[in-house]
Amino acid sequence: AGVALTPSLYTEMLKNPRVIGVKNSSMPVQDIQTFVSLGGEDHIVFNGPDEQFLGGRLMGARAGIGGTYGAMPELFLKLNQLIADKDLETARELQYAINAIIGKLTSAHGNMYGVIKEVLKINEGLNIGSVRSPLTPVTEEDRPVVEAAAALIRETKERFL
């Protein structure tokens, strides 16, 4: 909602036994380290920005919650496995490829989630409709972007899976 979670607020939140962790959506991966240190082993930190999944996991996030995972779940599962296997060179290459896909998903006039829905229709045969207001649907002008994003995902799967 546009509000940054501060270490002092998280420290206060940790006093509530119902708080088991936090999703960090800020871009600095140092914030993940801070929240991991504050919460300790009893609390989980999720990485938010899909573009930094690798960096977030290396800084201590135990998992991620991301908006683009649905368009390419196999790629994020592979990236997570590469981290577990300590194959960081390949992990970095895959993260770069994922970032190129994210760049394409976010380059249309329509909302990214609308683009993802169209990509899922092309790549997976899933017709799940469009986005609802206030999100902007994909336009006919966006068709080349959608097709390029779908192709990038297929090519990246062929390369890394």
Predicted regions and their residues:
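Catalytic alpha/beta core domains of metabolic enzymes, predominantly
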Residues: A1-N99, H109
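C-terminal alpha-helical cap/extension of soluble enzyme domains
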Residues: A61, M72-L161
